[in-house]
Amino acid sequence: MELAEAVRDETAMAMRLLGHLARAPRGGGGDKNLAVSPLSLHAALALLGAGARGETLDQIIAFLGPAGGPAHAALASHVALCSLADDSGPGDDRGGPKVRFANGVWVDAALRLKAAYARVVADKYRAEARPVSFRDKLEEARREINEWFESATAGRIKDFLPKDAVDRATPAVLGNALYFKGDWESKFDARSTSDDVFYLPDGGHVSAPFMSSGKWQYIACRAGYKVLRLPYARGGRGRGRDTGRLFSMYIYLPDERHGLPDMLRKLCSDPAALIESSAALTEKVPVGAFMVPRFTLSYKTNAAETLRQLGLRLPFEYPGADLSEMVESSPEAEKIVVSAVYHESFVEVNEEGTEAAAATAVVMTLGCAAPSAPVHVVDFVADHPFMFLIKEDLTGVVVFAGQVTNPSSST
């Protein structure tokens, strides 16, 4: 029960993030392609929460949602150990999605993680803790962290932390990386892909390659929009057991060409409707016109200001932040605050399936001055801006969320 409540909170957080970024005049905006991983951010905040206490911990929990601290810790642990655990290996040919989910902690060699924190992040979140020397070997430490992210995302996210992301006063960095590559349960025939018009938010249009199919599809019609579910192949049994997870992409297509902002506002204000609309997509319906664009997009941001604007302030403030459960007591430990939250996502959708990757890094510093029912035949022509989600359907967690406003652009 507590897991289901935490999943509802994670879905609501996904929509808050996407809605906020879509409205932002800088670093995104309603006329830009967007892709974020709410699950990656959730995992990084769980690592941060494990080292927080007092009002700082309370604010992190409140940001994650009303299910509460134990529920969100349980969700983060379940995702790391079960739902997105990397259980592939040599000779593993089950055919399901390839999934990697990794947590990491890098602490300056002059400091020491508290034993309780190290134990929790290792046992509950499968986080690898590594000492690095930010003070004496800064560039080597940054390179080591970036190589970890590149490896964990199968090379899709490179040079993640910029040169100015860490300095000699950096005490620690917390990280999450995830990678997903899955084939569609029912692949598109590339011979049926053809260029057509995609209508842009500014009233213009571009030519884009559209995938099409005459097969029945999982589509539901709601007030003002339609939802398409494209399941990924689950694969068979491996090593004597089932994969225990099921992934799908959901495309939310507004009825009106310029209806994406209104649809986003509606779904952000009622995330329960989002959950219900996806849960109801269990029956296929015959389709008339059916077109979905191929697209590749990437998005990178320092999410610190977004998190502040959404109510998570204390971890960034000195005095105020209490992250004293992370490292052993010292004058430096009492001054640790979050200086930046770097986040990057990559999503590619084509006839075969989807490849996606995400990285989140919480960088610390030492504090000083603060910073409706379906019809019998349904048309689904995604020739104008739409929203998408990639979810793990058995838990319901939102792994990726984004909007496509121009499939011919990668940003």
Swiss-Prot record:
Name of the protein in question: Serpin-Z1
Annotated site, Reactive bond, chain positions: G367, C368
GO MF annotation list: serine-type endopeptidase inhibitor activity
PROSITE patterns: SERPIN (PS00284)
Cellular component terms (Gene Ontology): extracellular space
Superkingdom in the source lineage: Eukaryota
Similarity comment: family membership: Belongs to the serpin family.
Record-linked InterPro entries: Serpin_CS (IPR023795), Serpin_dom (IPR023796), Serpin_fam (IPR000215), Serpin_sf (IPR036186), Serpin_sf_1 (IPR042178), Serpin_sf_2 (IPR042185)
Function field: Probable serine protease inhibitor.
Swiss-Prot/TrEMBL keywords: Protease inhibitor, Serine protease inhibitor
Species the sequence originates in: Oryza sativa subsp. japonica (Rice)
Domain notes: The reactive center loop (RCL) extends out from the body of the protein and directs binding to the target protease. The protease cleaves the serpin at the reactive site within the RCL, establishing a covalent linkage between the carboxyl group of the serpin reactive site and the serine hydroxyl of the protease. The resulting inactive serpin-protease complex is highly stable.
Cited PANTHER family: SERINE PROTEASE INHIBITOR, SERPIN, SERPIN-Z1
Region of interest called RCL, as start-end residue ranges on this chain: 353-377
